[in-house]
Amino acid sequence: MASRRKSTTPCMVLASEQDPDLELISDLDEGPPVLTPVENTRAESISSDEEVHESVDSDNQQNKKVEGGYECKYCTFQTPDLNMFTFHVDSEHPNVVLNSSYVCVECNFLTKRYDALSEHNLKYHPGEENFKLTMVKRNNQTIFEQTINDLTFDGSFVKEENAEQAESTEVSSSGISISKTPIMKMMKNKVENKRIAVHHNSVEDVPEEKENEIKPDREEIVENPSSSASESNTSTSIVNRIHPSTASTVVTPAAVLPGLAQVITAVSAQQNSNLIPKVLIPVNSIPTYNAALDNNPLLLNTYNKFPYPTMSEITVLSAQAKYTEEQIKIWFSAQRLKHGVSWTPEEVEEARRKQFNGTVHTVPQTITVIPTHISTGSNGLPSILQTCQIVGQPGLVLTQVAGTNTLPVTAPIALTVAGVPSQNNIQKSQVPAAQPTAETKPATAAVPTSQSVKHETALVNPDSFGIRAKKTKEQLAELKVSYLKNQFPHDSEIIRLMKITGLTKGEIKKWFSDTRYNQRNSKSNQCLHLNNDSSTTIIIDSSDETTESPTVGTAQPKQSWNPFPDFTPQKFKEKTAEQLRVLQASFLNSSVLTDEELNRLRAQTKLTRREIDAWFTEKKKSKALKEEKMEIDESNAGSSKEEAGETSPADESGAPKSGSTGKICKKTPEQLHMLKSAFVRTQWPSPEEYDKLAKESGLARTDIVSWFGDTRYAWKNGNLKWYYYYQSANSSSMNGLSSLRKRGRGRPKGRGRGRPRGRPRGSKRINNWDRGPSLIKFKTGTAILKDYYLKHKFLNEQDLDELVNKSHMGYEQVREWFAERQRRSELGIELFEENEEEDEVIDDQEEDEEETDDSDTWEPPRHVKRKLSKSDD
């Protein structure tokens, strides 16, 4: 780091000895009175810890002279020539400010340290906040002159110039504030003013300005520091002081919500990040701030894209910029403070989400507010167009162009903007704000007090208010046509819709998502098992529809919510018999309507695309309802009423009758038994198993597939009462035994029961399908528990759920039953009561009547044999 020269050679000369080119000053003691120090100059030549703009040590901003030469502390460069040394510093270390000084013009106080100037202000200017720093740069020396502005209540300034300065306003009338816009080149032609313009390309060279408080901003003005009486008559400020006056402002908001009055707080901002007004941040509060990052283009571009980087982005930036993550974090925090960016975590997440959805644009939308006394200036200069960047996310910000030379305050303007713009204005909010359609309005209220700063910035994006801009009829028509083709559009389709409809990518995706959600909920609420293909009825979110928007197939406005609002029976009344014949023939050929078939039908029937789509969709809906009704009737024959009520449609009145579909035969009990047995074996049959079931049962393969789908749905909801009984009946079949032999408990494998007398052999096997549901006799709850106890002798908690489901008993009942068996076993009494055994005997006798065997022998059931063995003992 470079340090100040320890030489006593002065670094300034009198202004009278200077030519217009401002050569190096020779003697500080002979300088103008305004720069006369009140302290020991040598004592105050000690470098300060940090400099106000560069946030680097002032100790590093002047180089040390060693043995008649100059040594650079940034590198190993040494030279005895001061000009060569300064050229080296300017070219190799552009961030370094050489030989900076701070002057309080009010007190003629000079110091080399900013800390000393702060202490001076606390001591001699207590409570004063309206300071203005003016930077004066002369070759190798940078002087910051501090003045005090007298700010009045209405935002104007007390006139400080004397009579001679007031007479010279025509000389400075062409000047404009360089804190807002770069100085015009023509300013350099006025040699008599001894003013030069300094163009800064880096953020740190531009003095920082207050943005959110009623404080004067510092203004960067390059001028001769001499304020002697001989030059006071001709030396004037570059920027002409313009007192506030009633002026109309041109307000062109990118989009204003319909019927919404917005109180808009005006704050100053600028599109160019190098010219954005900044909050003055005391460098002492950020000890680890590295000013070298201010010139890093990578960090500047990243900040301009999004001011809140993630940890992963900070890591990448640290690797690319060769700085530590902590330094980058502090730099981003300081930039947000400078630019007045303060978002909540929710706003950050919302802004990041919208940025990746394509709804947040990196180019800020701007609104121009131009006072007429500036825009109609007679000096021929371009008007001052002060743009404002959207500070909030999202937000509408207006700013007023001040005309004073100091621009110390950004007076908030409370504007009430109300209007009902057209739909195109809301959709095309990306268009730059300065449009010919701007409406001229007077500033209704100018409130420069600090209370106005507390007004919240009004938001422009409708999503921030929970309001969605309604889509037009043309937009909805395009979206519906695309939805009919594919419910999950590809990126190419989304891009095409964005070009046609003018909607953003996020809005299109949200519309498709909402439509799928509403359609799915409507199906589940109505319990309709419809054909879910690309031509299914679209259920549109009502928030997207307007009262004038047409539905698919009719131009009548939608009056009330209906799960299928687009299709009603009266749409088919006006079709001729020839049109219906062509449509039905096409539907029987294929229920999926292709584009080629649609064009052919349009040519033959002279119907519109929407009418044909509506007819096909309604046809498929009516067909599905009929099949569903038949399936319900079949389920009623083989299952309980609860199961039938679960799958019955809630409303069938809305489906028009269609005689083109064939009548499906009702399933017989034998067919239902085969299907249920197959369902117990596997809920997802293979294609070969489907073909086998179709061949054995005589049902159509599509009916079997549909039955399995409905049964799986009922099984998932716990509505299959017969499942466990069929499962227990087929358990022995999976071990190699037939389901009919399972009921012969206690019988050896090769032996069977004799058939009852008087019954012909095999007659029951022929007619057993006619018995329907009585084919299988179910065990009682205690019988299932008894079988489990005889097998395991105790209750395993892992099997408790299965026992509860099979026995249809409660958890506590099952536990109490097993506890009772355990107690009986310990006491040595009969484990099972007589009534339980009698019930099982009756059950077994009924089963014996149903089953036949070729064997003429008979053995008693297992439980009877146990009783006999006990009696023998």
UniProtKB/Swiss-Prot annotation:
Chain intervals for the UniProt region annotation (Required for interaction with NFYA): 272-564
Sorted keywords for this record are: Differentiation, DNA-binding, Homeobox, Isopeptide bond, Metal-binding, Nucleus, Phosphoprotein, Repeat, Repressor, Transcription, Transcription regulation, Ubl conjugation, Zinc, Zinc-finger
Q: Where along the chain is composition biased (Low complexity)?
A: 223-236
State where composition is biased (Acidic residues).
Answer: 831-857
SUPFAM superfamilies per the UniProt record, alphabetical:
beta-beta-alpha zinc fingers, Homeodomain-like
Primary location: nucleus
* Compositionally skewed regions (Basic and acidic residues) per UniProt: 212-221
**Where do the record's region annotations for Required for nuclear localization lie?**
734-768
One Pfam family in the UniProt entry: Homeodomain
- Annotated segments matching region Disordered: 24-63, 202-236, 626-667, 732-770, 829-873
Q: Which residues carry this modification: Phosphoserine?
A: S45, S47, S48, S202, S648, S774
> Region annotation Required for dimerization: residue ranges?
272-432
- Name a single GO cellular component: nucleoplasm
Q: Where can the Glycyl lysine isopeptide (Lys-Gly) (interchain with G-Cter in SUMO2) cross-link be found?
A: K159, K441, K454, K485, K629
Q: What positions are modified (Phosphothreonine)?
A: T36
Residue ranges of the region described as Required for repressor activity: 831-873
GO annotation terms (biological process): cell differentiation; negative regulation of DNA-templated transcription; negative regulation of transcription by RNA polymerase II; regulation of transcription by RNA polymerase II
Where does this one sit in the cell? Nucleus
Q: Name one GO molecular function term.
A: DNA binding
Zn finger (C2H2-type) location: 70-93, 102-125
As annotated in Swiss-Prot or TrEMBL, what is the tissue specificity of this protein?
Ubiquitously expressed. Expressed in podocytes.
Q: What does this protein do?
A: Acts as a transcriptional repressor. Increases DNMT3B-mediated repressive transcriptional activity when DNMT3B is tethered to DNA. May link molecule between DNMT3B and other co-repressor proteins.
- Protein family per UniProt: Belongs to the ZHX family.
Give the quaternary structure.
Forms homodimers. Heterodimer (via HD1 domain) with ZHX2 (via HD1 domain). Also forms a heterodimer with ZHX3 which is a prerequisite for repressor activity. Interacts with ATF7IP and NFYA. Interacts (via homeobox domains) with DNMT3B (via PWWP domain).
What is this protein's record name? Zinc fingers and homeoboxes protein 1
Species annotation: Homo sapiens
